[in-house]
Amino acid sequence: MKFDYDIVWTAHEIRIFDALRNLASSYGAERIVLFGSRARRTHGEKSDIDLAVFGCARFRDFSFAVDEEIDTLLSFDLVDMDGIVSPALAAEVERDGVILYEAVR
């Protein structure tokens, strides 16, 4: 996995990720990882934002808040990594993932 400061983001992505970090903190998430085409930087203009969410007891509330409170026309695809996740998906997140948020413990 990489950290978000390893990549040059657009101003729009920065605004989205800042809002996401605030929500992650508010909902008690331990870690948020971007994966998929945006993490690989192979995305198109309208590609969705794939997020792996770790350690969020209020995942459904968090997922709803992300959709409702983050101002973008892009769609989000959130995966609760504490639930049942295929080995292929877990490997993709580990291989391509970019850590956007990690709680301070």
Question: What are the residue ranges of the model-derived segments?
Answer:
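Catalytic core of pol beta-like nucleotidyltransferases
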Residues: M1-R31, A39-E45, F54-R105
